[in-house]
Structures are given as C-alpha cells and as structure tokens.
C-alpha cells in the first residue's frame, strides 16, 4: 500500500537531510504481512517528488460512444490540489486554466481540444472537482486485436498564466457492455 507524506513545511532552501525511522511493528503490521515479506526496513521504491503550487491530484478518462459507435464523447474528470498552505493563501480566489489536447498516437495528429478556465475555490487543499468533454469524430477504436491508442496531453496553468504541470496519459476509445447476456466491446460480441 503506497503512503504519501507532505514534507513541504520541513524543507528549507539549500541542502536538506531526510531521515526516515522504520518501526518493525505497528498497528498496520498485519497489512504488511499480506505479501509474506516479514522484514523491517524500506524494501520498495521510494520517491521524493516536488509538485507545483497547483497540480493534478487525480484524473479519470471516460469514453462514451454514440448509438452506432462511430463518434465518441471523451470526458475527463479532474481533481486538482494545492501543494501547501502557503500556496493556498496565494491562489485562493484566483483564476487558473487547464487545456486538454487529444492526439492520435500513430500519427501525432490532434483530434480534439478542451480549454477551461476556473476560479480556484478550495475545499481544504483540493480544488473543487470538475470535468471537460470533447466530441471526437470517428476515432480508431481500441480492441484486443487492434489496440489503437490516443494520447491526452493535459496542461495546468497557474494564476500567472504559466504552465504549472504537464501530464500525458495514453487511452483507447472503447465501450464495454453486457447486453442481452453477452459481453460486447464496441457493440461486437467478444
């Protein structure tokens, strides 16, 4: 189970020393034994990540077909977060913007774009979640036989209109459904 710790308030300009104390037994010890790895210490990957003042906390992509599976609605659900209490004071009430560009991976051709400006209203350190959608005409559909992929390039702009973060995510246009007792992908029986 991944764990994340915000050390923003403990970091100073210049050189810092990061010390980690590991306890062999804790209230979560029974969880640690689930993989039968009963050693103490850090034995999995550890990363130290620096995030911009406003950044993507979570994103979810949905693709919805029209009735004949020719055109699709691309929907991006976003949860943005503010990186620190200091950034919270700076950004509260300011305007920010996201831009989502969709590219066909095999050709690099842009197939859609969504731009949305929003007021930064905070619920603790999370910006109110929102979604954007784009209609994409006749995308190449994803299936196991033809794994056509597209690329989402998401740009988050801060209140100063500078790029705060760029995230890329590959995805496919497909529709899975259980219809008349049959499993179907893109309207075709599996």
Q: What are these model-predicted stretches?
A:
Residues 70-120, 130-132:
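Beta-strand-rich binding/interaction modules
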Residues 1-58:
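Accessory beta-strand-rich segments of carbohydrate-active enzymes
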Residues 8-12, 118-128:
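Short proline/glycine- and polar residue-rich coil/turn motifs
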Residues 19-21, 151-155:
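Extracellular recognition modules
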Residues 60, 153-190:
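N-terminal carbohydrate-binding accessory modules
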Residues 3-5, 126-134:
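Short strand-edge motifs at loop-to-beta-strand transitions and within beta-strands
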Residues 23-30, 107, 157-166:
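Short acidic/polar inter-strand loop motif in beta-rich domains
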Residues 11-15, 87-93, 135-149:
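Short glycine/proline/serine/threonine-rich loop/turn segments at secondary-structure transition edges
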